[in-house]
């Protein structure tokens, strides 16, 4: 995992020194690792039992920070389907809004129609609007029948 601190450094703004939790999920197995962040840019390595399906940075929202952590669509789809992580689902939808493939539109449509949290459904509707293709339009129109 590569971590960059992007704040503009100066006399009153310095590098953060913090323990940052990174969570890896593969099936039902959850592995938490701690990255001790202290430099402008650092790479961290974690021993895992297999390829993770989901990777979450600061999953407990310990730090007040703007985290940009782009993930491949496959991981975002898995994160969107994780019933235990409501905020993770919202974050996945926000990233999926930049993808226009049929699989992603289908996953967003499913979230729009079935997610138990209204905030995820709202973000899914916004994402489909941003995707702005025929499949997304069809998904939005179908959702008006809820």
Pin down the residues of each PLM region.
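Non-catalytic accessory/interaction domains
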Residues: 1-130
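Extended amphipathic alpha-helical coiled-coil/heptad-repeat regions
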Residues: 133-146
